[in-house]
Amino acid sequence: MSNTIIGYQNRIDAATFAAYGSWSTTLPLTNIKTRQLSKKARSTNAANSSTKLRFSLDSERIIGSVAIVNHNMQKDATWRYRVYSDSGYSTLVYDSGTINVWPLMPFGSYEWEDSRFWDLQLSAEEIALFTKTLTYVPDTVASAQYYQIEFFDSTNTDGYVELGRIFVGAIYQPEINMSLGASIGDETNTIVDVALSGAEFFDRRNSSRVAQFTLDHLAYNESIINGDIMKISGVDAEVLYIYDNNTALDLHRRAFLGRLRALSPISQPYNTRYQTTYEIKELL
């Protein structure tokens, strides 16, 4: 298990999109810069030449965490993330290579009679349980201004690729992992009404994932970083939560875009160690 990851200070709102790929004029790429995940950008078709984008940030930034949120990519889709040092996109400084959008499950995950026994792919029903979110942590980071993301989903039955939000931000990973007792669960948003007879009626709504954990053994410099994360993020700004980046099979379950539900103080329970707690609620 890798140490938990918090992405913060999303830089996408200051980005400028270049003319690249083919995107709808009624659902343009600028929709990605809104916080409403349902307000999407949509490609004009599903051709690989259309489903790609370029953007420049307001200045050179060190980007350590990336997410594509509320997309519609299907089980055979792949994608690629690249970083450049020049506006002509000719000097490459980072290349993720081609990555599967959805994981392949280990052989034996499904019963012989299951249609997924051989292809080992998640079903559409499994995928629909969660907000469709791609998360990516580059293995090396560079200070750069120019970014390119490509999606390869030409057989998408919708006939296009659409995206609700992009997260490109800073990253924090504690030197010592969160303490035992960390949790991640679902908090219902369903409304329950009770009739005079006692019968219950439900307005079912998507639940929000909530992560709670404590960092008990922070060095002094980490205590400063965590204080800065609280200050920068408040309870309104987006954070990207990744429970364990090494478990690629479950990233769609245990990584999400959220916000801090409360701001916790930095305490000093030991002579040279500091402590803080996090509660992160998923944004829908």
Task: Describe each region flagged by the PLM.
Residues 1-51, 56-78, 82-284:
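Extracellular/virion structural assembly segments
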